[in-house]
Amino acid sequence: MSKRKITNLFNVDFKPFDNYGKPVPGMSWHKISYDRANGGYGTYLLKMDPNTKSLHHVHSGYEEFLMVDGELIDLDGKIFKKGDFVTFEPDSTHSSYTKE
């Protein structure tokens, strides 16, 4: 099939996370199907180093992610752990951070 794409999650190149315009220190990503031009929809892999914080942001659509490893703490103190599938609905706002 010529319209098939296979991504091996253990063999990808991560680039600085620049979805907010400029790179966020400690964050990197690998775009799989993400396209900012279509409203920022699609899939990507995101890595956050220890002691890293995302910028506070508003979601125009759904944001969904699977915690593959580690822990992520949201602005309200909720801790997302390995195996958690998290959904933020449209118009939700938040930021998240990692500890050591």
Which role does the model predict for each range below?
Residues 1-40:
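A short, N-terminal "cap"/entry segment at the start of jelly-roll beta-barrel domains
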Residues 27, 43, 62:
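Short coil/loop residues immediately preceding or within conserved phosphate-binding loops
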Residues 37, 90-100:
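Ligand-binding loop in jelly-roll beta-barrel domains
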Residues 44-46, 54-59, 76-78, 96-98:
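Short histidine-centered beta-strand/loop micro-motifs
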Residues 59-75, 82:
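Glycine- and acidic-residue-biased ligand/ion/polar-headgroup-sensing regions
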